Amino acid sequence: MPELPEVEVVRTGLQQWTAGRTISEVAVLHPRAIRRHVAGATDFTARLRGMRLGDVHRRGKFLWWPLRGEQALVGHLGMSGQFRLDADPGIHTRVTFDLDRRLLFDDQRTFGGLWLDPLVDGLPTALTGIAPDPFAAEYDRRAVVATIRSRHAPVKAL
């Protein structure tokens, strides 16, 4: 599974090649890749077609692009997911996007995925329970210290 530094490298690369581009076409080649988008592949592709991708963001190991209408395209790489640019689809390609260039979402083990999620205060609703990264602008060190001092639990449970 890609660790946080690798996901940040992916975010940086995607930012350069996807931010501000419009999705002209989407194809879902494997339904498991969008399993969290319960409305299915037809709805997923219809809602994304013509959308302009905003800047790529990351919270934990999740990536997202804000879209108009207070929604976001959210992705998680799972154990083997990757985005490839200007490549031919292969046997592990799960979703393709045409944005002037071709962007592929490949996932050999299909543990990763993509979905659309409403934004609340700029954050996809599925990610509201994930704390900000210590290097993020919204990280409040004093609040974290106060929370840790007020609880008697293993660190991971905080």
Kindly give the residue locations of the regions a language model identified.
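Phosphate/anion-contacting hairpin/loop surfaces
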Residues: L73-L158
